[in-house]
Structures are given as C-alpha cells and as structure tokens.
Amino acid sequence: MIEVAEIIAREIRRGKIVEIGVGFYLEVAKRLRESGIDILVVDINEKAINYARKQGIKGVVDDIFNPTLGIYKDAKAIYSIRPAPEMMKPLLDLARKLKIPLYIVPLTGDRTPNGMKLINYKGIPIYKWEP
C-alpha cells in the first residue's frame, strides 16, 4: 500500500492531507509524513487514534457519517484505504463539500461511487475524484 502514499505525495506536494478510517494501519500516513506532508488521521475508534498518536501521527476522532467540517479545514486532499462500502458515499460527499480530491483504495470487489476515475498505479487500483 506504500504505492498509495507515492501517488498522493506526487499529486499533492504540500499541505494537509487527511486519511479517514485509518484503523491501526499507519504505513501510508507514515510515508506521507516522511515525504514532508502534513498528515492527519481520522477514525471513529478512539483506540485507533490513540495508537496513531503514540506512533507520532496527528489524529482526531470523527464520524464520517456526521463529519465535523472544521477538522478538514485547509485540507488539500482526503483518502481512505479499504473503507467499508457504506463509507464511500459519505467520503465522496465530504470531498465535494470541501472541493478537494478524494482517493479511495477499495477492497477487491467493492464498488466505488460513480464519477471516480480509476488510476492503476503499480498494480494498486486507486480511485480518484477531483472537483
């Protein structure tokens, strides 16, 4: 999944990027941070956010189904790695409200919302929406 960090860092060179639904997998966020990106991870699970903070990653508890828009202020992009299918439409809705790019790496077989473009990067299917 490090490839996801590569393409995001290549396309969004600076500024704040937010990973939504981070869980306990921090490799993409760590790689983006190493690239000089201001990374923020978000999850509804407080334990996941505490884990991220212990790893030196900024994290905030939030619910994608009722997002606190102030958290995403000044974000240049949002992304999600293998989000649950029911999260995909709210992710796209948030990106549209914020008018920023959205990157989703779905689980194999999951359908992404209409209007997202497939980027096949080093064998990883990454779906992107941009305003």
Swiss-Prot record:
Write down the Pfam families for this protein, in alphabetical order: UPF0146
Name the domain of life this protein comes from: Archaea
Origin species: Pyrococcus horikoshii (strain ATCC 700860 / DSM 12428 / JCM 9974 / NBRC 100139 / OT-3)
Q: What is this protein called?
A: UPF0146 protein PH0209
As for family, the record states: Belongs to the UPF0146 family.
